[in-house]
């Protein structure tokens, strides 16, 4: 259970894609530091082009239980970040319940595989629609509440290592994650006058349902040269990172200890991007 004197005590965090994996980890870790949580996830299939299983209502319920186990309050709802009206309604309800909004973790995203010229319209539009447009809609819905609260705050945009380098075999994903860098850096300038910081993080090889090892193996078997764009991590040559390791960085960026940082791209990759 979180201590009353946690580093984020009295603050409120809005976390997308919160039903499982990174999103749940971020929500729970922020709660452990004293923040109350607004948690959302679609809890349904995003598109027929996304081949791994979606999060479920039961997953979101488990996030709620985990946050409450930390002694914090949580407002959870099944919302598609592509749905502007539902996002705005949730933000309004969160502010009404908790009185403020201080932290946004724009975490929700989807991944797919395919060479750029072989992608279907549905594959392209789903990934861009969720990862880029959905993130923009999230920020458009939450930023006014942060400004109105007048407390400054921190926005963490969850991009990817694919937002900093080429990733053959999922160029639509890389395009969406690169675009988040421009979104992050522009917003960092625009929100500076309000004391709101905006940074992006770029995780690499995290153990979540999105990884789809079989899809990766099939892609590399068909196109062996692509494997060079997915090197092992120098600090951890085998296996994947855990969501909790990414949450270490999210919690730090949410708090005052990172107060000098805004408009930064932070690789969370155990050195892999240095190859």
From Swiss-Prot:
Residues that coordinate or bind NAD(+): 20-22, 41-42, 80-81, 107, 177, 206-208
GO molecular function: oxidoreductase activity
Keyword field: NAD, Oxidoreductase
Superkingdom as given in the UniProt entry: Bacteria
Protein family (similarity comment): Belongs to the short-chain dehydrogenases/reductases (SDR) family.
NCBIfam families for the chain: PRK12826.1-3 (NF009467), SDR_subfam_1 (TIGR03971)
Protein name: Uncharacterized NAD-dependent oxidoreductase MT0715
Lineage, uppermost ranks: Bacteria, Bacillati, Actinomycetota, Actinomycetes, Mycobacteriales
């Amino acid at each position: 259970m979180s201590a009353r004197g946690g580093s984020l005590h009295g603050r409120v965090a809005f976390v997308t894609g919160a039903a499982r994996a990174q999103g749940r980890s971020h929500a729970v870790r922020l709660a452990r530091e004293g923040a109350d949580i607004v948690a959302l996830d679609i809890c349904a299939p995003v598109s027929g082009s996304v081949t791994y299983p979606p999060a479920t209502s039961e997953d979101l319920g488990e996030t709620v239980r985990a946050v409450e186990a930390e002694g914090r309050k949580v407002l959870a709802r099944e919302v598609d970040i592509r749905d502007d009206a539902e996002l705005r309604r949730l933000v309004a309800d969160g502010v009404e319940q908790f009185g403020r909004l201080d932290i946004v973790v724009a975490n929700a995203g989807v991944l797919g595989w395919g060479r750029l010229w072989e992608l279907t319209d549905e594959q392209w539009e789903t990934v861009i629609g969720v990862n880029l447009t959905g993130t923009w809609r999230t920020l458009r819905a939450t930023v006014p509440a942060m400004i109105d609260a007048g407390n400054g705050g921190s926005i963490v945009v969850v991009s990817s290592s694919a937002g900093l380098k080429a990733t053959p075999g999922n160029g639509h994903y890389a395009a969406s994650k690169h675009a988040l860098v421009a979104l992050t850096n522009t917003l960092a300038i625009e929100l500076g006058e309000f004391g709101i910081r905006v940074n992006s993080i770029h995780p690499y090889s995290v153990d979540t349902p999105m990884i789809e090892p079989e899809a990766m193996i099939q892609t590399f078997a068909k196109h062996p040269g692509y494997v060079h764009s997915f090197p092992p991590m120098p600090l951890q040559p085998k296996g994947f990172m855990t969501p909790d390791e990414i949450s270490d960085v999210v919690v730090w960026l949410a708090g005052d200890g990172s107060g000098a940082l805004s408009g930064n791209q932070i690789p969370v990759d155990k050195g892999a991007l240095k190859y």
